[in-house]
């Protein structure tokens, strides 16, 4: 049907996914769709959806790579796939998907980059919540000389791959216009620096950068709390006292 009428691709996908509820159909669906991709490569989108629904996430990833990233529709498809992997707690594969997107997309849209970086931050945070000590971080261009050094500040830690990854994220953020998405990315990076690296000064820098990126009021409140905590944890007690002390021209009441 879709060979002659591509508009039925979504309909065909839905019908095949319903058929996949019966596990006895899996072999037939797999073999039929694989054969069909030779005639019509667009069938790969159905095959990737089938693999995803049946929990074959690595195979779904392979199909998405074969489809490629050739236009904005592909960009949206890839980011949705990476986000869904993260929601399925497939964090390592999700991180790999975000990295693949960042390495292979040719559409330098700040919103796309912001969403990918935000997704990475959330995937890392999921790893923090699930495993407090043994974390796996995927390296993305660990030896990166594309950006000038003034865009980044080296981290004083022994985990060089992680340090280079964070530096690379900072260098990208330095080139992106401020937006709500970049504000969240800065906030997430600050949490990684504080919770994993115990780099409270670096985390404070990230939180302050987040404040400059047009955050909403809810995020502003979270950032302000984090900045105060970082000052205390870094031993900057005099500065933290000034930070927490209300200004003299502010009316303090029970709601303050």
Q: Model segments located where?
A:
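Acidic, polar-rich low-complexity tracts and alpha-helical solenoid repeat scaffolds
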Residues: 1-256
């Amino acid at each position: 049907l879709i060979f002659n009428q591509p508009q039925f691709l979504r309909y065909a996908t839905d019908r095949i996914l319903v058929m996949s509820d019966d596990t006895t159909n899996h072999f037939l669906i797999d073999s039929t769709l694989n054969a069909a991709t030779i005639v019509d490569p667009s069938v790969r989108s159905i095959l990737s959806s089938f693999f995803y629904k049946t929990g074959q996430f690595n195979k779904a990833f392979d199909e998405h790579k074969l489809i490629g990233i050739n236009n904005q529709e592909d960009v949206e498809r890839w980011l949705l796939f990476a986000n869904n992997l993260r929601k399925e707690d497939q964090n390592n594969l999700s991180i790999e998907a975000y990295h693949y997107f960042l390495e292979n997309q040719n559409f330098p849209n700040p919103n796309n980059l912001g969403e990918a970086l935000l997704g990475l931050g959330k995937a890392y945070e999921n790893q923090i919540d699930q495993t407090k000590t043994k974390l796996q971080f995927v390296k993305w261009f660990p030896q990166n000389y594309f950006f000038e050094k003034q865009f980044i500040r080296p981290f004083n830690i022994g985990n060089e791959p992680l340090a280079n990854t964070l530096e690379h994220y900072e260098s990208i953020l330095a080139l992106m216009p401020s937006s709500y998405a970049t504000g969240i990315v800065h906030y997430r990076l600050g949490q990684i620096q504080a919770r994993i690296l115990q780099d409270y000064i670096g985390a404070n820098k990230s939180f302050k950068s987040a404040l400059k990126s047009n955050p909403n009021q809810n995020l502003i409140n979270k950032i302000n709390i984090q900045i105060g905590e970082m000052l205390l944890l870094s031993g900057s007690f005099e500065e933290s006292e000034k930070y927490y002390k209300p200004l003299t021209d502010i009316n303090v009441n029970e709601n303050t």
